[in-house]
């Protein structure tokens, strides 16, 4: 099933400000990816700013990849402020199943902050759903659960949209579920490629006027198409892929999304 692009042009017209509390591995890549797409990144995790920055932003991304110092407190404060001013909040629960500190951080965030989108790999979402899964650090790992059911369960439990990234991506808001069949095997070879996807989703949510399911679906299709285009002619050249991915995000058009997107609903 093909899709019509609704939000990409709006991102480039509106240049939304994306507040990222992200990890030290992903910060540069996420910022450059957002710039390439047409959004404006703001990369701040200073707890002293968390009552102000969300008030000038259009969306907040909380990524727990490298929890340092007062990061958890900053995330909670920023999330609560974002909820107060009514901007969407995206959660990337990096490696939530790896340590008790990460699990407790996510438990507290989900209890105290309302999220518009939770984006993670299969292992991360299985952990949030309480399903048995053999995660490998921050990587997806292996398991035998129904991932569509996991996406729907988490979406219903927290009243949000869920995106599970993998060879086939799954998007659900608990009542409607779609799968995205674009992408490339080079994505897992580049660190922070999933973190950038969360940031890209945030840019789409920022201009979606509350239509978070359709915005997440288009964001996922757009990003995975950019990956396909970047990977053309490459096999193991992951360094070239990373740079070309930024170029393809900048070159992406609504027409390309409509022509190349492969989704099942």
Swiss-Prot record:
GO terms for biological process: thiamine biosynthetic process; thiamine diphosphate biosynthetic process. It catalyses: 5-(2-hydroxyethyl)-4-methylthiazole + ATP = 4-methyl-5-(2-phosphooxyethyl)-thiazole + ADP + H(+). It is an enzyme of class 2 (transferase). Pathway: Cofactor biosynthesis; thiamine diphosphate biosynthesis; 4-methyl-5-(2-phosphoethyl)-thiazole from 5-(2-hydroxyethyl)-4-methylthiazole: step 1/1. It comes from the Bacteria. Its EC number is 2.7.1.50. InterPro entries: Hyethyz_kinase, Ribokinase-like. Gene3D superfamilies: 3.40.1190.20. Pfam families: HK (PF02110). Its cofactor is Mg(2+). Keywords: ATP-binding, Kinase, Magnesium, Metal-binding, Nucleotide-binding, Thiamine biosynthesis, Transferase. Substrate binds at residues 43, 192. ATP binds at residues 119, 165. GO terms for molecular function: ATP binding; hydroxyethylthiazole kinase activity; magnesium ion binding. Belongs to the Thz kinase family. Catalyzes the phosphorylation of the hydroxyl group of 4-methyl-5-beta-hydroxyethylthiazole (THZ). HAMAP family: Thz_kinase. This is Hydroxyethylthiazole kinase.
């Amino acid at each position: 099933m093909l899709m019509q692009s609704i939000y990409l042009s709006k991102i480039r017209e509106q240049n939304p400000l994306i507040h990222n509390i992200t990890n030290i591995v992903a910060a540069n890549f996420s910022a450059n990816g957002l710039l390439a797409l047409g959004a404006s990144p703001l990369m701040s995790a200073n707890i002293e700013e968390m009552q102000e920055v969300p008030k000038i932003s259009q969306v907040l991304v909380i990524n727990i990849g490298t929890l340092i110092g007062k990061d958890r407190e900053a995330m909670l404060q920023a999330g609560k402020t974002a909820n107060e001013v009514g901007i969407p909040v995206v959660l990337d629960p990096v490696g939530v199943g790896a340590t008790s500190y990460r699990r407790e951080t996510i438990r507290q965030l989900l209890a105290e902050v309302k999220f518009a989108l939770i984006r993670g790999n299969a292992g991360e979402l299985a952990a949030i759903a309480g399903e048995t899964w053999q995660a490998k650090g921050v990587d997806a790992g292996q398991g035998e659960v129904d991932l569509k059911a996991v996406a729907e369960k988490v979406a219903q439990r927290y009243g949000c949209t869920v995106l599970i990234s993998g060879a086939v991506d799954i998007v659900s808001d608990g009542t409607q579920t779609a799968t995205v069949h674009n992408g490339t095997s080079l994505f897992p070879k580049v660190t922070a490629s999933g973190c950038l996807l969360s940031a890209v989703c945030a840019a789409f949510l920022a201009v979606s006027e509350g239509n978070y399911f359709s915005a997440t679906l288009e964001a996922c299709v757009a990003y995975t198409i950019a990956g396909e285009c970047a990977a053309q002619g490459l096999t193991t050249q992951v360094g070239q892929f990373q740079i070309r991915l930024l170029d393809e995000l900048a070159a992406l058009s609504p027409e390309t999304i409509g022509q190349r997107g492969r989704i099942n609903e």
